[in-house]
């Protein structure tokens, strides 16, 4: 019974967007399985299912390795919104302060975004230094960051 139920869970996860354990439990009940949320929770853990982002504020269950990751622009937008505390500049530099532990991942996303004016980033634990060339492009870089954070 457990094996059949877990096969059905995998089938459901692969064919539908499931946001919560309760949604999954309801679909299993409709398919003839007598389950509780606790049973579904144990199955999810045993199967190693993960929650992956589907949009800015939404997640769904997925089998590891099958979910399409967010594109770099979407990931950058999300990271900027969720982790940036302040944005400052001086001369040809833009300095982003982040929640501790987030600077390196955000800097990598900025690097992979290939912003023409940003010739490099340096990141610590909670600070990112963006080197901008020419210096006159600093306002446009700040504006781009502000738009992405909206």
From Swiss-Prot:
Domain of life of the source: Bacteria
GO annotation terms (biological process): L-arginine biosynthetic process; protein complex oligomerization; regulation of arginine biosynthetic process
GO MF assignments: arginine binding; DNA binding; DNA-binding transcription factor activity
Cytoplasm in keyword set: yes
Pathway per the UniProt entry: Amino-acid biosynthesis; L-arginine biosynthesis [regulation]
Keywords: Amino-acid biosynthesis, Arginine biosynthesis, Cytoplasm, DNA-binding, Repressor, Transcription, Transcription regulation
InterPro entries per the UniProt record, alphabetical: Arg_repress, Arg_repress_C, Arg_repress_C_sf, Arg_repress_DNA-bd, WH-like_DNA-bd_sf, WH_DNA-bd_sf
Compartments in which it is found: Cytoplasm
GO CC terms in record: cytoplasm
Family of the protein in this entry: Belongs to the ArgR family.
Function: Regulates arginine biosynthesis genes.
Name under which the protein is recorded: Arginine repressor
Lineage: Bacteria, Bacillati, Bacillota, Clostridia, Eubacteriales
């Amino acid at each position: 019974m457990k094996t059949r139920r877990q096969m059905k869970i995998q089938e459901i996860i692969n064919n539908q967007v499931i946001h919560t354990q309760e949604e999954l439990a309801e679909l299993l009940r409709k398919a003839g399985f007598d389950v509780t949320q606790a049973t579904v929770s144990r199955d999810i853990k045993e199967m190693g299912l993960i929650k992956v982002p589907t949009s800015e504020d939404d997640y769904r269950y997925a089998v590891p390795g099958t979910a399409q990751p967010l594109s770099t622009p979407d990931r950058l937008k999300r990271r900027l919104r969720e982790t940036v505390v302040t944005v400052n500049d001086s001369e040809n530099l833009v300095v982003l302060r982040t929640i501790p532990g987030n600077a390196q991942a955000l800097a990598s996303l900025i690097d992979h975004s290939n912003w023409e004016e940003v010739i490099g980033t340096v990141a610590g634990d909670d600070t990112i230094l963006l080197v901008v060339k020419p210096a006159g492009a600093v306002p446009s870089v700040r504006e781009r960051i502000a738009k992405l954070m909206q």
